[in-house]
Amino acid sequence: MNEVTEVKVVETVDSLFRAHYGRLVRALTLACNDHEVAADAVQEAFVKAHLHWRRIQHYDDPVGWIRRVAINRLRDDHRRQSRKGVALQRLAGEPPGESVEQHGFDSDLPAILAQLPRQQRIAMALFYVDELSVAEVASALKVTEGAVKSYLHQGRARLRSVVASGEEVHSDE
């Protein structure tokens, strides 16, 4: 890539970063309940966008590609942490899942969302915080629109139930 082309790529990716970084981080923070992890995932996605710009510049939705990369990073981190937790439990002689901490209801929305099943949490964050359409959420999660509607319905029902009764929310994961 020549210097002029590289400058244009940097300017384009920088412009996308300024326009979308905050919204992506907010949505993914609700999805993973950790601002730093969400920010790292989004930053890494933008770095990858810069590195692969020649290819993704032709996509219909480059920001969707960036969002997908960030979500994949969160999923990879989650899988890695889950495997690490199971390994530590086995080393300690505990059956996996027995020492999983149960969280109670809290008026803090991110804490409540963090306790929803992962797909519901991510779908709700992308739909309500990132303001994506059902079709865009489906594309980002690589599921059908019907699945997204189901995740949103189940998530709203679960949150309504929690708010109405003050019961504890426990993840089905």
Regions picked out by a protein language model, each given a short descriptive name:
Residues 36, 135, 146:
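Residues within helix-turn-helix
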Residues 123-127:
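A short pre-motif secondary-structure segment
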Residues 71, 75, 141-165:
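DNA-recognition helix of helix-turn-helix
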Residues 84-113, 133:
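Internal acidic/polar
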Residues 2-26, 36-39:
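A short, charge-rich alpha-helical start-of-domain segment used by transcription regulators
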